[in-house]
Amino acid sequence: TASPARTGDTSYLMYGSDQMALNIATVFRCVKLLSESVANLPIQVMRLKGDLFTADNSSRLNYLLNIQPDNNTNAFDFWVQIVQNVLLTGNAYIVPVYNPVTLEADRLALCNSSCVMHDTTYDRYTISDFTNGVYGVFDESEVIHIKGLTLDGKNGLSVLSFARLTSGIAATGDNETLKRFANGGNVRGLITNDTSVRGFGEYQDKQLDKTAVDVDNKFSSGQHIVSLPGQVDFKPISLSSTDMQFLESRKFTVREICRFFGVHPSFVFDDTSNNYKSAEMANVAFLSTTLNPYLRKIETELLRKLIAPSLATKRKFQFDRRGLYACDLDSRVK
């Protein structure tokens, strides 16, 4: 019995999870770049002394934010996971767990986004994350909620929820490239009978269907020359890569994905024409327009949820941005 004929593929990204988008090289690089750029910066717990804010290195929060937030997680992986959650799911939920004796934060539990239900009407979070040992109903003030782009101020949306069409095109392009290399660039087409109306019927239709399956299987097996029986004709219908401007469309999707993430193409190794000065300016623009909003969002949320309102003007959290300005003397002076 002949195997069924192949049909057109639908991009897995249209119906799959957002995490599957990491199979696309540009998405993977953008997510990795943003998450590791945030994690690479130490965050300082600052205390007001006189008229100046100074680092409070003896604070328990300093240890949690820079060394070990949870029992089995280091700070770098912790911040990487937070930014990845924001980019891929739109939300990152952190629950501070306090020591009942000292009343200090004992650990910062990063919850799985799928285990959190946010009731925006009553501003409550229902969490059932037994892996991280966090479950119950929490008030809005008890959960550190880092959001992506939000339309209502309460729930974040992932970048991929807006870039799904472009990402789907990129995924389809990758699949098409794989198929072109896998089958040697075999063509697609129609099996027809050149006798027009004469001789057609149920039996002839079944024979044409069987011929189509046989020809498709022969092309799939790697044959380049296939004989057709009788007056059966094969008419190719697929366009070549040149006709489809296939490579140009793939270049376009790379830059289109970069636009959604706010990442310059040079950071995903797409633009090879940059000189040293333009690369330096791209790095400065990346910090000021792309990375800094994420840093500011995290700093504000930590201050709001970890510091009492009466001390909010005397404490602050601040990422040390000096490392990112290492090559830009003008920005370091400012």
Predicted regions located by residue number:
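Structured, contiguous alpha/beta core segments that scaffold functional sites
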Residues: T1-F246, R250-F252, E256-R259, V263-S266, ...
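Charged substrate- and nucleic-acid-binding regions of tRNA-handling and nucleotidyl-transfer enzymes
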Residues: L324-K334
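Small-residue-rich helix-loop
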Residues: A279-E280
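Long, compositionally biased
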Residues: N283-A308, A312, K316
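A glycine-rich phosphate-binding loop feature that marks nucleotide/adenosyl-phosphate handling sites
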Residues: L228-K235, T272-N275, I307-L324
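A general alpha-helix detector
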Residues: G189-L190, T253, I298, R332-K334
